């Protein structure tokens, strides 16, 4: 079985080695056909604490790492402008 992947935005990085990633899912409503967006929040493992709030990341499914954590950050697609300014 292939591992699932999601792309989302980091909304919290306050935990040690864990980030919260918000993934937006858009789909047409079954009856009214209006596009509906649902946001799901995943806790993902970040081994080096390198990801900051606002970063766009790709997460992949892993074995259960804790009670709520079943995803890991695979790669950082883009850094947020605020995170880049904080480094300087």
From Swiss-Prot:
Gene Ontology terms, MF aspect: rRNA binding; structural constituent of ribosome
Which pairs of positions does the record mark as disulfide bonds? none
**What InterPro entries has UniProt attached to this entry?**
NA-bd_OB-fold, Ribosomal_uS17, Ribosomal_uS17_bact/chlr, Ribosomal_uS17_CS
* BP-aspect Gene Ontology terms: translation
Show the GO cellular component annotation of the record: cytosolic small ribosomal subunit
Q: Which UniProt keywords apply?
A: Ribonucleoprotein, Ribosomal protein, RNA-binding, rRNA-binding
Keyword rRNA-binding appears in the UniProt entry: yes
Which proteins does it associate with, and in what oligomeric form? Part of the 30S ribosomal subunit.
Main role? One of the primary rRNA binding proteins, it binds specifically to the 5'-end of 16S ribosomal RNA.
Record's family? Belongs to the universal ribosomal protein uS17 family.
- Which PANTHER family does this chain map to? 40S RIBOSOMAL PROTEIN S11 FAMILY MEMBER, SMALL RIBOSOMAL SUBUNIT PROTEIN US17M
What name goes with this protein?
Small ribosomal subunit protein uS17
The species is: Synechococcus sp. (strain WH7803)
As recorded in Swiss-Prot or TrEMBL, the protein's gene is named: rpsQ
